[in-house]
Swiss-Prot record:
Cofactor names: [4Fe-4S] cluster
Residues reported in the UniProt entry to bind [4Fe-4S] cluster: 305, 308, 351, 358
Protein known as: 4-hydroxy-3-methylbut-2-en-1-yl diphosphate synthase (flavodoxin)
Reactions it catalyzes: (2E)-4-hydroxy-3-methylbut-2-enyl diphosphate + oxidized [flavodoxin] + H2O + 2 H(+) = 2-C-methyl-D-erythritol 2,4-cyclic diphosphate + reduced [flavodoxin]
Coiled coil: none
Summary of the function given for this chain in its UniProt record: Converts 2C-methyl-D-erythritol 2,4-cyclodiphosphate (ME-2,4cPP) into 1-hydroxy-2-methyl-2-(E)-butenyl 4-diphosphate.
SS bond list: none
Signal peptide: none
Pathway(s): Isoprenoid biosynthesis; isopentenyl diphosphate biosynthesis via DXP pathway; isopentenyl diphosphate from 1-deoxy-D-xylulose 5-phosphate: step 5/6
Gene of this entry: ispG
């Protein structure tokens, strides 16, 4: 049998125009960028700086902040200055709705401090004011050499365009469904706005598009269509994904399918946090998604079995949890000290069934004893058994072996 039948790999990455957002490149065959958004009142400089810093430290490469009124616009340059004093050079993206033209015009320091402007075609202006107010933002973006994201959202769709397409569809011999017309409206809203931005003098290398909806199948359909019709860089995100497990699963499925097709240049996982919850979770989920799909490496992987009736205790679970926590804690220092350590794979297994095999496939692994097994834990490094641990301090001994391995393999000294 031909072995190639079983091989699978992502489709070739869609070719898009690269866009510089500060010092971060989006599109143009660059690695997929993880970004996030604050939920603080931007006018509260202290709170916003604190959250941006936390998102940056978690791994967000771009952070979007709301700019919804004069006080928020006035705070942006202060936030930028404070972050730079703290040593954080993260590009800030301004999120504008309704009065973006006014805020950018009246607060030039804000326009200068931001690395990108997000514009929503559905509420940039209405009626005769729409094109004029859109043009004002494009003129400011051109003046300050800033890129824009034209961010269409299902929940704030351009009603004039939707009405037009609904009326045209009604005249067809075989009309599309309402859902299909809405999908087409989302796509056309993004593309028509991008075309207008180009007519107004903004280069293709200054335009990113997004077309967010809250249904997984709709999102896949919209982005697949958008990817076929243009070569602009694309920002992926499932809007209103929800809370907890549901939000993680919905976003991961939708974005994972698109990424597997080669579609997507930057992602944001939109999760509704619990009250007082950790805002950085959306960054971690985004990184995990890209890493498990093999597109990027952010952190070492710890493989651990789920446990079953063969496992005698929770020792292997506790060890796996502790090792993963230690790796996460040390990564800010290790990225500099041990280049390449993010590609490390560690296996912590609970019995003889899959333990030795999984440990051999990892860079370093341990197979703890299960029910009825000899109270010994073989350690494997790069496929070879190097030691067998016994006694009450197996966990501590393995941690020491792991630390030595990291130093020897990734240390530059």
């Amino acid at each position: 049998m031909n072995a190639t039948y079983y091989l699978s790999k992502p489709l070739e990455r869609r070719r898009s125009v690269g866009v510089a957002v500060g010092d971060v490149m989006v599109g143009g065959q660059n690695p997929v960028v993880v970004q996030s958004m604050t939920n603080t009142d931007t006018a509260d400089v202290d709170a916003t700086v604190s959250q941006v810093a936390a998102l940056w430290q978690a791994g967000s490469q771009l952070v979007r902040i709301t700019v919804d009124r004069d006080e928020a616009a006035a705070a942006v340059p202060k936030i930028r200055e404070r972050l730079e004093r703290l040593g954080f050079s993260i590009p800030l993206v301004g999120d504008f709705h309704y009065i973006g033209h006014k805020l950018l015009s009246e607060h030039p320091a804000c326009a200068e401090a931001l690395a990108k402007y997000r514009i929503n075609p559905g509420n940039v202006g209405f009626g005769a004011k729409k094109d004029r107010q859109f043009a004002e933002i494009i003129e400011i973006a051109s003046r300050y050499h800033k890129p824009i994201r034209i961010g269409v959202n299902w929940g704030s769709l351009d009603n004039a365009l939707l009405t037009q397409l609904m009326n045209e569809n009604a005249q067809q011999e075989n009309p599309l469904s309402v859902a299909e017309v809405m999908r087409e409206t989302v796509v056309q809203s993004a593309l028509l706005s991008a075309a207008l931005a180009e007519e107004l003098g903004l280069g293709r290398d200054k335009i990113i598009l997004s077309a967010k909806v809250s249904d997984v199948q709709d999102l896949i359909a919209v982005y697949t269509t958008l990817a076929e019709r243009c070569d602009y860089a694309l920002h992926l995100g499932l809007t209103e994904a929800g809370m907890g497990t549901k939000g993680v699963v919905a976003s991961s499925v939708a974005l994972g399918i698109l990424l597997q097709q080669g579609i997507g240049d930057t992602i944001r996982i939109s999760l509704t946090p619990e009250p007082g919850g950790d805002r950085t979770r959306e960054v971690k989920v985004g990184q995990e998604l890209l890493q498990v799909m093999g597109f990027r490496q952010f952190l070492p992987v710890v493989a651990a079995c789920p446990g079953c009736g063969r496992t005698t205790s929770t020792v292997f679970q506790q060890l796996a949890q502790k090792i993963e926590a230690d790796l996460h804690k040390n990564m800010p220092v290790w990225r500099e000290k041990y280049p390449g350590v993010e590609s490390l794979k560690v296996a912590v297994m609970g019995c003889i069934v899959n333990g030795p095999g999984e440990s051999k496939h990892a860079d370093i692994g341990i197979s703890l004893p299960g029910v009825g097994e000899s109270p010994a834990a073989p350690v494997f490094i790069e496929g070879q058994k190097v030691k067998t641990l016994r006694g009450d301090h197996i966990a501590e001994e393995f941690e020491g072996i792991l630390s030595d391995y990291i130093h020897k393999r990734f240390g530059q000294g």
